[in-house]
């Protein structure tokens, strides 16, 4: 266990019960005034670097409802990637990308001492601002703007006066991303070794946030103000997702200060569609990442606060969400973004039987004044089911040393420039190959982790580190010179597979039969050819692609590259032409790119049935 030296700074703690006050969050009816007492916590023998403004670990003491509270904070070292970038635009439209220094940032997460279920997300840039959970209840804290005073207000969000408007909701109306099979826990599933390894591996979401022009105007045309707000939001996201073994690294922030790059409209489905296409066409070509979220201050139609594609993580167009900056309290905006990202990760809206130990959970369809940062049992199981079935690969990859937004910080579990390894804090590290205090290898060690590292030594050259996953994949071998398994290699695209029923595409063999089984269950088969003629209609039941929200009919030769038609073979169903359709994710149920659509032909990415040699 990490030993700490406690250096007390003498600041009295005088709780004061107030009746009403105007704070950044609005008019608060019930609050306490506290004077946090700082207790600096450093590992025994550690010395704070003179150029370091913000310590890696801090403690604060104050009282809530007359009871002492000890707030334990650690710098959120996963917040940024090493080459974190910010993009804005010059008056003549030129792209300006910078890499601001973010090594010594002031964003922390933590917990309350002696409260196992507690958590905290705090900005310590100018006093303490953020939230903490104490005994199952969520409190907000922010400094009072008084001269020469350390006074802070502590209050519950439910005590902030609300504007007279309908509660904000998520725009997703039907969230099933695949068949309505009963959800089972991992212990109930017959998982393959590959699925079990995938499920137990930590996940890393490399995130880019885009702030639109109306956000730029809302915050006084200040890039710094927008940056600060988004940093605080991502800090909260990290606390929320850490319980799922998911780490969120901010790779980039883009601000549309010279006008929007898409039409940001009140109609959420149109805006999300345009944003996803812009991400695939433009943003991904400039900045490789896993997920993008658009933050806007436009009023969406109705009480909608956001919208996200369901079960879409890692998809170049659909791994995206849009969120309204609907509240002064950044905690509430972070909850909305966590909710939409939850949809990207396969989670549906909570139903009445779902529970998280609080009055409202992350995936509730309505944002509540009693909102919590907890995922319900339903969300956890749906997320697990999505991971097992889809195994999105991009989130397995740690951010590269050259990708992580913040320069190297030892102890954040991310190996960054200048580090050999990173096993967490000295208190948490259990890796004998890595010195947790220095993030350097221990004497005699060649490596600390990786598929080609065994007991601190490189595995012998030729050792299989990634077995072939099917006939379109190949086994990858250790080189004997590195702890990392080489880049995943596949059979060439277009090679026949599955007894000539398909063609290899990016290591898989996409065939319609398997896609129907995934959507409708084990008894499903591909529908008769005549059903695919519906794809010439150009409506939700059949089309090939969308342009500016309009569904484009398939040309006669392309009908097998549009909507997938199946038959579930269940006795109660007589319709031989069945499709999977959900308005919130119309892409679900389309024929997968690379699927065979005729002899020597495969579906291209723009849903045309072309010669297999040109399809990829």
Curated annotation (Swiss-Prot):
Keyword Chaperone: no
Amino acids binding Ca(2+): 409, 412, 414, 416, 419, 422
Motif D/ECD-tripeptide positions after renumbering to this chain: 471-473
Subcellular location: Secreted
Residue numbers bearing the Pyrrolidone carboxylic acid modification: 195
E.C. no: 3.4.24.-
Residues of the signal peptide: 1-20
Residue ranges of the propeptide: 21-194
GO molecular function terms listed in the Swiss-Prot or TrEMBL record: metal ion binding; metalloendopeptidase activity; toxin activity
Annotated glycan sites: 377
Residue ranges of every copy of the Peptidase M12B domain listed in the record: 203-399
Keywords: Apoptosis, Calcium, Cell adhesion impairing toxin, Disulfide bond, Fibrinogenolytic toxin, Glycoprotein, Hemostasis impairing toxin, Hydrolase, Metal-binding, Metalloprotease, Protease, Pyrrolidone carboxylic acid, Secreted, Signal, Toxin, Zinc, Zymogen
Modulation of this protein's activity: Inhibited by EDTA or 1,10-phenanthroline. Not inhibited by PMSF.
Tissue expression as described in the entry: Expressed by the venom gland.
Primary location group: secreted
Listed cofactors: Zn(2+)
One GO cellular component, as annotated: plasma membrane
Residues the entry annotates as binding Zn(2+): 339, 343, 349
Disulfide bonds: 314-394, 354-378, 356-361, 410-439, 421-434, 423-429, 433-456, 447-453, 452-478, 465-485, 472-504, 497-509, 516-566, 531-577, 544-554, 561-603, 597-609
Record InterPro entries: ADAM_Cys-rich, Disintegrin_CS, Disintegrin_dom, Disintegrin_dom_sf, MetalloPept_cat_dom_sf, Peptidase_M12B, Peptidase_M12B_N, Reprolysin_adamalysin
Cofactor comment text: Binds 1 zinc ion per subunit.
Quaternary structure and interacting proteins, as annotated: Heterodimer; disulfide-linked.
Other observations noted: Negative results: does not cleave fibrin.
Function: Snake venom zinc metalloprotease that hydrolyzes the alpha-chain (FGA) and more slowly the beta-chain (FGB) of fibrinogen, without affecting the gamma-chain. Cleaves alpha-chain of fibrinogen at '432-Lys-|-Leu-433' and '535-Pro-|-Met-536' bonds. Induces apoptosis in vascular endothelial cells and inhibits endothelial cell adhesion to extracellular matrix proteins such as fibrinogen, fibronectin, vitronectin, collagen I, and collagen IV. Also hydrolyzes azocasein, and insulin B-chain (at the '38-Ala-|-Leu-39' bond).
Family that this chain belongs to: Belongs to the venom metalloproteinase (M12B) family. P-III subfamily. P-IIIc sub-subfamily.
Protein name in UniProt: Zinc metalloproteinase-disintegrin-like VLAIP-A
């Amino acid at each position: 266990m990490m030993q700490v030296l406690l250096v007390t700074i003498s600041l009295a703690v005088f709780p004061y019960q107030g009746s009403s006050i105007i704070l950044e969050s609005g008019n608060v009816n019930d609050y306490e005034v506290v004077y946090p007492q700082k207790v600096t916590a450093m590992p025994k023998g550690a010395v704070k670097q003179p150029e370091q403004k913000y310590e890696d670990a801090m403690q604060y003491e104050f009282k809530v409802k007359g009871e002492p509270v000890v707030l334990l904070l650690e710098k959120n070292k996963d917040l940024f990637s090493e080459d974190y970038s910010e993009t804005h635009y010059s008056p003549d439209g030129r792209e300006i990308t910078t890499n601001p220094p973010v090594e010594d940032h002031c964003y922390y997460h933590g917990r309350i001492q002696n409260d196992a279920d507690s958590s905290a997300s705090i900005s310590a840039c100018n006093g303490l601002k953020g939230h903490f959970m104490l005994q199952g209840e969520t409190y907000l804290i922010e400094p009072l703007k008084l001269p020469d005073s350390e006074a802070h207000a502590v209050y519950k969000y439910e005590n902030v006066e609300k504007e007279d408007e309908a509660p904000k909701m998520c725009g997703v109306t039907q969230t099933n991303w695949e068949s309505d099979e009963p959800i089972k826990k991992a212990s109930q599933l017959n998982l393959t070794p590959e699925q079990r390894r995938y499920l137990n591996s930590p996940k890393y979401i490399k995130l880019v946030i885009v702030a639109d022009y109306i956000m730029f105007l809302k915050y006084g045309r200040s890039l710094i103000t927008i940056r600060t707000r988004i940093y605080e939001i991502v800090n909260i996201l990290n606390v929320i997702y850490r319980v799922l073994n998911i780490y969120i690294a901010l790779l980039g922030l883009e601000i549309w200060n010279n006008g929007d790059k898409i039409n940001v409209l009140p109609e959420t489905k149109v805006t999300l569609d345009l944003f996803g296409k812009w991400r695939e066409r433009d943003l991904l070509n400039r900045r490789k990442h896993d997920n993008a979220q658009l933050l806007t201050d436009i009023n969406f139609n109705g009480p909608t606060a956001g919208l996200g594609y369901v079960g879409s993580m890692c998809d170049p167009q659909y791994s995206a969400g849009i969120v309204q900056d609907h509240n002064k309290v950044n905690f509430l905006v972070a909850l909305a973004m966590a909710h939409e990202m939850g949809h990207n990760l396969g989670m549906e809206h909570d139903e009445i039987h779902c529970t998280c130990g609080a009055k409202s959970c992350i995936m509730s369809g309505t944002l509540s004044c009693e909102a919590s940062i907890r995922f319900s049992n339903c969300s956890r199981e749906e997320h697990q089911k999505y991971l097992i079935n889809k195994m999105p690969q991009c989130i397995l990859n740690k951010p590269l040393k050259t990708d992580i937004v913040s320069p190297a910080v030892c102890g954040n579990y991310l190996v960054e420039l200048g580090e050999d390894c990173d096993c967490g804090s000295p208190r948490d590290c259990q890796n004998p190959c890595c010195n947790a205090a220095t993030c350097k290898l221990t004497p005699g060690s060649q490596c600390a982790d990786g598929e080609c590292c065994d007991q601190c030594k490189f595995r012998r050259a030729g050792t299989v580190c990634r077995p072939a996953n099917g006939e379109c994949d190949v086994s990858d071998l250790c080189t004997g010179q590195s702890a990392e398994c080489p880049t995943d290699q596949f059979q060439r695209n277009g090679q026949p597979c599955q007894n000539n029923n398909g063609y290899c595409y990016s290591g898989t063999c996409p065939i319609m039969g398997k896609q129907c089984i995934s959507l409708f269950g084990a008894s499903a088969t591909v529908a008769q050819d005549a059903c695919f003629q519906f794809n010439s209609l150009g409506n939700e039941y059949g089309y090939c692609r969308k342009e500016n929200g309009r569904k484009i009919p398939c040309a006669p030769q392309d009908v097998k590259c549009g909507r997938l038609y199946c038959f579930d073979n269940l006795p109660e169903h007589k319709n031989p032409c069945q499709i999977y359709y959900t308005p919130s994710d119309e892409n679900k149920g389309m024929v997968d790119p690379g699927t065979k659509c005729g002899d020597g032909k495969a579906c291209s990415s723009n849903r045309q049935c072309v010669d297999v040699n040109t399809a990829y």
